[in-house]
């Protein structure tokens, strides 16, 4: 199983969750030459019958439910007659809410809006020397937060660092209408 999150040109991607549409197309071209793409039905058949998968079997999936999955990835998958599984995080459907990792990225991307006093205090508190180290530290802390309440408390502190750009379209998740469009495609399994 090959996992993707996003197919988009965001210009800022410190976690490397995105692949550009051009690179996605090139990757699929390469993968088609060297791997045996299987669809969900084949995957389930091999899994449920304990039959060996074909050599170099490959199933693509997407996590999270970003709008670019429909707008950028799906047309490429359809053109290549490939199928992918899409796992949708439903909490952000039809909203302008950001995933916590996107919120962290956006705060650090918008460097001119960072509150330097808060930045200096956090750097000193955690014994770090630059914003990049702080970003990595906070990302790890958020990923390993033991509970949702611990993560939300940490996010509240992080929000004191800076503001989020008003254009959230690069991080937008699917709308209900777009989810139905995605589900209608033979190249998508949700």
Please tell me what each predicted stretch does.
Residues 1-190:
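Catalytic alpha-helical scaffold of carbohydrate-active enzymes acting on polysaccharides/glycoconjugates
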